[in-house]
C-alpha cells in the first residue's frame, strides 16, 4: 500500500511524499527543511527524489536532501537536467519502479520545455502543468504545447 503525504512549502507550494512502509519517494522538493522534518517525524528513509522540472521552487532542496540521504536516487527530466547532480534523466515513455509501484513518465512541455509528469497507481504528479484551478503559466513553452500536454493528461485513466 502506498500513501501520499502532502508537505506544505513556501506560501503556496506542496511537496509530495509517496510512502511505502518506512520508505518514501519525494516529488519536487523545493525546500529541504519541511521534508526533513516530516521524514524525521515519521521515521522514513528517503529512497529517491523525483523532479518534474528545473525551477527553484521544485529543486531547491535537492542538494540538502542528498547530503542527508546520500544513497537516494535522483530522477528528473532528460530535457531539463540538473547539471550539478548525477541522476537518471527521464524521457516520455520511461518508467520508474519502486517497491512494486510503477510510475510512467509523460513529457508535458508548456510550463518548461522539458517538463515531465509521473503517473501510475491512480496517482499523477504533474508539477506546474496542472492545478486544481487551471493550468500553469508558460515560461518556456508555447500555448500549443501546453494545450497538447493538458490533452495528454486529460486522456489518462
Regions found by a protein language model. Give the residues of each.
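Residue-level detector of functional hotspots within protein domains
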Residues: 4, 76, 80-82, 104, ...
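Metallo-beta-lactamase
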Residues: 102, 113-157
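Short N-terminal signal/transit or membrane-insertion segments
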Residues: 48-55, 109-119
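Active-site HxH/HxHxD metal-binding segment of metal-dependent hydrolases
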Residues: 10-11, 24, 29-104
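Conserved beta-strand hairpin/beta-sheet module of binuclear metal-dependent hydrolase folds
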Residues: 1-44, 117-133
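Short, flexible coil/turn micro-motifs enriched in small/turn-prone residues
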Residues: 55, 88, 95, 105, ...
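Divalent metal-coordination and catalytic microenvironments
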Residues: 18, 28, 53, 65, ...
Amino acid at each position: 500500500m502506498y500513501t501520499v503525504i502532502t508537505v506544505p512549502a513556501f506560501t503556496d507550494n506542496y511537496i509530495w511524499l509517496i510512502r511505502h512502509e518506512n520508505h518514501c519517494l519525494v516529488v519536487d522538493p523545493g525546500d529541504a527543511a519541511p521534508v526533513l522534518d516530516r521524514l524525521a517525524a515519521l521515521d522514513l528513509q528517503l529512497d529517491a527524489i523525483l523532479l518534474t522540472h528545473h525551477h527553484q521552487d521544485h529543486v531547491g532542496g535537492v542538494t540538502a536532501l542528498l547530503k542527508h540521504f546520500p544513497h537516494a536516487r535522483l530522477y528528473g527530466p532528460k530535457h531539463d537536467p540538473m547539471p550539478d547532480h548525477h541522476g537518471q534523466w527521464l524521457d516520455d515513455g520511461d518508467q520508474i519502479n519502486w517497491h512494486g509501484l510503477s510510475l510512467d513518465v509523460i513529457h508535458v512541455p508548456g510550463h518548461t520545455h522539458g517538463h515531465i509528469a509521473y503517473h501510475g497507481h491512480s496517482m499523477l504528479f504533474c508539477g506546474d502543468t496542472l492545478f486544481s484551478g487551471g493550468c500553469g503559466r508558460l515560461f518556456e513553452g508555447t500555448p500549443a504545447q501546453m494545450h497538447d500536454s493538458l490533452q495528454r493528461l486529460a486522456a489518462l485513466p
